[in-house]
């Protein structure tokens, strides 16, 4: 396993980060297997773990807490806050009220006295950044949190957070987590340049594009049983409705993916790689990327990913990928991750008045 610095924190983290979104009732309900995946990842050299308060309604944090018991000092532990995690009006967001409450819930579930990287799970545009960063800075001062970050934020928001932190002398975000894959290269336009400018870390989520780049899908077959495309038809899809669009085969972008897959598989074969290993290594070829999040749901999936940990793409392979899918390209809009609230139909014209 190779390691990279997390921005300018001086902390070294593994090039691959273990994602736990599929742990618990929204994914793998076999707690023992989930714990075994964590142990296997740690044994393989992964020292960076990603989870969130909303993954399986907090169950993922609980499982991670059990899994790292006795090995906590070997782990750079990241979790998130911001998305709705309760029935109350204030059980979400970037307010001091919610941050101070939810960090205690996460610490309890994770069975730890501190979180290494506490990330805001998408921007909260209804709350002043001074409010959010002030509360988070207090957590750093208290020792409950070591570093701060955000997830799936646009470049302008990253710039604003850095400015507010500097002007108000508050702790800064040291990491951004966004979707980045061969099919989702939009972050190459503005997000990754911003990350490099501010010397932040960058962790890439969905490097396999939700399973599209594993070789599971083709235009000639239905989604394999247990795959994300299959599971979004059930309760999991209801909990994460955007995932239904990501696997809607009638959408033009998804149809284009089906057309591109054979060509990508050909590029991988020429490089002596599987499509999955080429895809999981792809984000690491960008200088701004710190770590790539892999979220195996089963031991079998982890074993498949593990075999590609040492893969490093060469220039000819990267050139072939660029020729097929240009830098900065987003194939399917549903994969973007962050959607401006002003583009959501329900709020697009909420301030409009009159009948003209």
Pin down the residues of each PLM region.
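Glycine/proline-rich, positively charged
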Residues: 26-27, 39, 43, 86-190, ...
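Glycine-rich beta-alpha junction loops
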Residues: 81-83, 154, 180-184, 206-217, ...
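Aromatic-lined glycan-binding groove of carbohydrate-active enzymes
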Residues: 187-239, 274
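Terminal-tail/helix-coil boundary detector
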Residues: 221-266, 270, 285-290, 299, ...
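Short, well-ordered coil/turn segments that N-cap beta-strands
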Residues: 11-16, 45-47, 71-75, 112-116, ...
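N-terminal small/glycine-rich loop or linker at the start of catalytic domains
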Residues: 8-26, 78-91, 114, 119
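N-terminal binding-site loop/beta-alpha segment at the start of enzyme catalytic domains
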Residues: 1-75
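Conserved, mostly hydrophobic/aromatic
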Residues: 6, 18, 34, 49, ...
